């Protein structure tokens, strides 16, 4: 069996189609002076062909995925046609007498390597996008064949060293049942696209292309993160049964789509979705989300060469507001920094970026960024039920300063005659121990809290969740973390406010009953987790959950706490 990184869930059965292109061989010989013009023309001609191909892919991506994914390929075209890139390549041809392919390879590889050296995991994975563009350019310069994935005629499971975003956008979805790659990560554009399409995918296997041949029969189990190669009939029958069970469970859960998240004894909470773009709203609605508990606006700031303008942001926020209709959308202001840097911003080199210049600290230092974003959100609030949420808050002073800024921008919009929601709600992320311990004071300043358990856990336990050596210490169900969460919920309720949660813990089935019993008002998670969490809530009594929470929070260790929770779940047969 083969395993890797589970990129998109599902189970598929089919023959393997191994994607292998002609090897790109770079001609590194020195050219003569009278060959320079010819090589420059080879580069420009190859670039023109590559740009035309990307225009076609961009159009198809827009039709299949929506405007946000179309914008990815608009970015690819912009990079390919970038004047500085052109000048660098032509300079190498003219000054160093390099061939067109050698010059293009050196410049593109230099850009990709620079991205890989960054600490930011997201930007590291953008190196694959740059190499995707470079590979297409080189194949056109060299006159090599480019595989047309949209022309696949048989039902297959794709096996490749890697699938680039442009290749993924070309997939014939009636024929491609899923894909497996040697490389890739869960946050790559390819993985994100697979989830958008609900196409089973496992990436980062390391060696699937060396273990699979064309026409091998595969079972892609992207539920348990396993790939079976030429399995026995017994294994096939067993996995068919698993597939039927998964499909049956999915169908049963789908029946809950339009039902409220209400317990057997009548206590109701909200189950919402975390989104990154307007395209995600469709999946949220399909899975029964009752709103958007976290709209991550930082994706608007990524995959581009400059900060988005107020108008660009307004268009994006308006699209989400209109797509969600009467449902509330919590718009988190830009959460950049930490593990998410922007190549066009001058980030300082920091010993610990998670404790440094990030999120609201950047916005308060760079008021023009804050102004553009808040004005855009306010203007979009005229088209739906938007709420504003600030990340990385540690003090009441910050909240008061931010509210003053909002009032300034509101007055600007009034003076300009631009509509907005005068009573728009303002909330904060509680993701630092500082915010949690002064929650009783913060609750007087805002309309709601949303607990970010990923960072709250990391900061409370002093554990870098990206450090494999101590990752076992990262325990969101630690009594210390859970008692802080309870303190925050109680503080908000004492002021007549509500508390939601948008961290990974909100979608953790083992934590649902505990959080419910602690009084959490809103659970926000990946859309795909919503049906199962809603089922758990609808199958329990709120009073039982409160008893569980009281007992669990009194436990001294995580193991004892989890033993209690697991016993309760088994006895109630809830999950």
Curated annotation (Swiss-Prot):
Inhibited by oxalate. Mg(2+) binds at residues 431, 455. Pfam families: PEP-utilisers_N, PEP-utilizers, PEP-utilizers_C. Phosphoenolpyruvate binds at residues 296, 332, 454-455, 465. Its EC number is 2.7.3.9. Keywords: Cytoplasm, Kinase, Magnesium, Metal-binding, Phosphoprotein, Phosphotransferase system, Sugar transport, Transferase, Transport. Phosphorylated on Tyr-122. Phosphorylation on Tyr-122 is important for polar localization but not for interaction with TmaR and for activity. GO terms for biological process: N-acetylglucosamine transport; phosphoenolpyruvate-dependent sugar phosphotransferase system. It catalyses: L-histidyl-[protein] + phosphoenolpyruvate = N(pros)-phospho-L-histidyl-[protein] + pyruvate. Transmembrane segments: none annotated. The active site is at 189 (tele-phosphohistidine intermediate), 502 (proton donor). GO terms for molecular function: identical protein binding; kinase activity; metal ion binding; phosphoenolpyruvate-protein phosphotransferase activity. Its cofactor is Mg(2+). Changing residue 122 to F: Is not detected in polar clusters. Is completely diffused throughout the cytoplasm. Does not affect function in sugar uptake or interaction with TmaR. InterPro entries: PEP-util_enz_mobile_dom (IPR008279), PEP-utilizing_PTS_enzyme (IPR050499), PEP_util_AS (IPR018274), PEP_util_C (IPR000121), PEP_util_CS (IPR023151), Phosphohistidine_dom_sf (IPR036637), PTS_EI (IPR024692), PTS_EI-like (IPR006318). It is an enzyme of class 2 (transferase). GO terms for cellular component: cytosol. PROSITE patterns: PEP_ENZYMES_2, PEP_ENZYMES_PHOS_SITE. The reaction takes place in three steps, mediated by a phosphocarrier histidine residue located on the surface of the central domain. The two first partial reactions are catalyzed at an active site located on the N-terminal domain, and the third partial reaction is catalyzed at an active site located on the C-terminal domain. For catalytic turnover, the central domain swivels from the concave surface of the N-terminal domain to that of the C-terminal domain. The N-terminal domain contains the HPr binding site, the central domain the pyrophosphate/phosphate carrier histidine, and the C-terminal domain the pyruvate binding site. Homodimer. Interacts with the pole-localizer protein TmaR. Binding to TmaR is reversible as long as TmaR can get phosphorylated, whereas binding to non-phosphorylated TmaR is very strong and shifts the equilibrium toward binding. Belongs to the PEP-utilizing enzyme family. This is Phosphoenolpyruvate-protein phosphotransferase. It comes from Escherichia coli (strain K12). The gene is ptsI.
């Amino acid at each position: 069996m083969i395993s890797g990184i589970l990129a998109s869930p599902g189970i598929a059965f089919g023959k393997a189609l191994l994607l292998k292109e002609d090897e790109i061989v770079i001609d590194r010989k020195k050219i003569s002076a009278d060959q320079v013009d010819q090589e420059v023309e080879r580069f420009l001609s190859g670039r023109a062909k590559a740009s035309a191909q990307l225009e076609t892919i961009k159009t198809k991506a827009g039709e299949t995925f929506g405007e946000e994914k179309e914008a990815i390929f608009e970015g690819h075209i912009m990079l390919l046609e970038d004047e500085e890139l052109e000048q660098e390549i032509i300079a190498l041809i003219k000054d160093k007498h390099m061939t067109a392919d050698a010059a293009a390879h050196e410049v593109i590889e230099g850009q990709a390597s620079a991205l890989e050296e960054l600490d930011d995991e997201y930007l590291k994975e953008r190196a694959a996008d740059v190499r995707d563009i470079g590979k297409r350019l080189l194949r056109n310069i060299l006159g090599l064949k480019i595989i047309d994935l949209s022309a696949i005629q048989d039902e297959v499971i794709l096996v490749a060293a890697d699938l680039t975003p442009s290749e993924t956008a070309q997939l014939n979805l009636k024929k491609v049942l899923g894909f497996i790659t040697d490389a890739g990560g869960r946050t790559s554009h390819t993985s994100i696209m697979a989830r958008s399409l609900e196409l089973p995918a496992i990436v980062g296997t390391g060696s699937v292309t060396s273990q699979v041949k064309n026409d091998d029969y595969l079972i892609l189990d992207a539920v348990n993160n396993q790939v079976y190669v030429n399995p026995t009939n017994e294994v096939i029958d067993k996995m068919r049964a698993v597939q039927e069970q998964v499909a049956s469970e999915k169908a049963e859960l789908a029946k809950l789509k339009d039902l409220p998240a209400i317990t057997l004894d009548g206590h109701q909470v909200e189950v919402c979705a975390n989104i990154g773009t307007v395209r995600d709203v469709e999946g949220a609605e399909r899975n029964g989300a009752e709103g958007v508990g976290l709209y991550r606006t930082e994706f608007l700031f990524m995959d581009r060469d400059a900060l988005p303008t107020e108008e660009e942001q307004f268009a994006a926020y308006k699209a989400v507001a209109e797509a969600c209709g009467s449902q509330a959308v919590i718009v988190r202001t830009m959460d950049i920094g930490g593990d998410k840097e922007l190549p066009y911003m001058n980030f300082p080199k920091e010993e610990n970026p998670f404790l440094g210049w990030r999120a609201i600290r950047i916005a308060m230092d760079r008021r023009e960024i804050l102004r553009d974003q808040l004005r855009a959100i306010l203007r979009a609030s005229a088209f739906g039920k938007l709420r504003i949420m600030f990340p990385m808050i540690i003090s009441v002073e910050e909240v008061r300063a931010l509210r003053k800024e909002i009032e300034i921008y509101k007055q600007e919009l009034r003076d300009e005659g631009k509509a907005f929601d005068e009573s728009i709600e303002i909330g904060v992320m509680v993701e630092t121990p500082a915010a949690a311990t002064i929650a009783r004071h913060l609750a007087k300043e805002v309309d709601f809290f949303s607990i970010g358990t990923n960072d709250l856990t990391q900061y409370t336990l002093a554990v870098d969740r990206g450090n494999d050596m101590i990752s076992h210490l990262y325990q969101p169900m630690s009594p210390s973390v859970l008692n802080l969460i309870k303190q925050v919920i109680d503080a908000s309720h004492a002021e007549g406010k509500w508390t939601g949660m948008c961290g990974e813990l909100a979608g953790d089935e083992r934590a649902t009953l505990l959080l419910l019993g602690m009084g959490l008002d809103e659970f926000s998670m990946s859309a795909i987790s919503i049906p199962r969490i809603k089922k758990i809530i609808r199958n329990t009594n709120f009073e039982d959950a409160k008893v569980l929470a009281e007992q669990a929070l009194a436990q001294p260790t995580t193991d004892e706490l989890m033993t209690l929770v697991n016993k309760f779940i088994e006895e109630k047969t809830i999950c």
